[in-house]
Amino acid sequence: MEILIANPTGLCFGVKRAIATLERELSRTKAVYSLGSPIHNPQEIERLSKLGLIVVDSPNEVPYGAVSFVRAHGITPAAYQALRERSPLIVDGTCPFVKTAQERAKTLSQEGYVVVISGDVEHPEVQGIMGYAEGDVIVISSEDEIPARLNGQRCGILSQTTQKVASFASLVGKFVSISPEIKVYNTICKATLARQDSVCHLASKVDGMIVLGGRNSANTRKLAEIAADAGVSAVWIEHAGELDRGWLENRRKIGIAAGGSTPDWLIKDLIEKLNMM
């Protein structure tokens, strides 16, 4: 069995930066409180928790005087202010690409546009971006969800950084026909684009694809969807222990693609297990 690895794959710049920033602070501080999971990979969060990371759901759970951490997905301005009232030090791990999307949302709303975000309204990154819009803001996952009230409105459109390019392009195309004026910012990050392209390319060369990453990772889910759309048999697993030996039978070439929040050590574990089978 031949194993081919998507290139690029695994940790993106923003997640690497967040982990490195968090690790530096953990080396100096016994406990660091993160508002929400710093990244979407349960195994890596477990490792960081052993170093002193504490994940909380609300600023009110952060003890007064404790060090706080802003996750890679970012948070709303209101949440940041709530942390500031409790923490003398806030370590900001927000991905720079997410920061750009936040700034675009703020600018568009100040210019009088209805801010339209292409993405998942339940995702923390999207919720954070929404907080920067000072006026009307709506999140749409597909063109079928566009409400009638937006017909004839000036709309400013941007994207969740991990959105599929095709989904974003389709949504923009629809707004061209219903809005008298649109302003578009493609805020899909370059790392996402590169990983999506690498999966498309690799899927045509293998007879099975393994997509590795957290179940709560939006970018990993998109990679799994792209692999399946390419027509290759694909499985999505969080770690090597979930790999089904039966799925591997009679497969001669296996492709591996890892989400942008999947650390190298998990990829290495998977390759080692495949080589032992």
Where do the PLM segments sit?
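The feature marks the mature, well-folded catalytic cores of soluble enzymes
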Residues: 1-277
